[in-house]
Regions:
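Fe(II)/2-oxoglutarate oxygenase catalytic core
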Residues: 1-82, 88-112
Length: 112
């Protein structure tokens, strides 16, 4: 998934020269937002150069939720949609009110 799809998207969308830089997956994990457990995640930055969020749940699987950036931009992506951004941008996982929202998260470092 990463080397065939996500890596090339990072190179293209952020104008990173693949001949001069390498992408290193610092961490990858699944986050489960559940109305009975972790409902949200407060504003934070990630400890890497780039962050990728791949939505695993369909919008019909939960109510509420989404990713919101400090500037007010809110994205409620559907299953298979991907959000890529600088890890230095403050963002949060908005509260879900029912159901389960799952996302696959990658923390990426750009190495010269």
């Amino acid at each position: 998934l990463f080397s065939e799809k996500l890596g090339p998207l990072l190179f293209d969308n952020f104008d990173i020269n693949p001949e001069a830089y390498k992408l290193n997956i610092k961490d990858a994990f699944i986050v489960k937002y559940d109305e009975n457990k972790q409902r949200s995640l407060e504003y934070h930055t990630d400890d890497s150069d780039m962050s990728i969020i791949v939505t695993l749940s369909d919008n019909n699987d939960y109510s509420g939720g989404g990713t919101q950036f400090k500037n007010g931009l809110t994205i409620k992506a559907n299953a298979g949609d991907t959000i890529m951004f600088s890890s230095k941008y403050k963002h949060q996982g908005l509260e879900i009110y029912s159901g389960i929202r799952m996302v696959l998260v990658f923390f990426i470092n750009v190495i010269k």
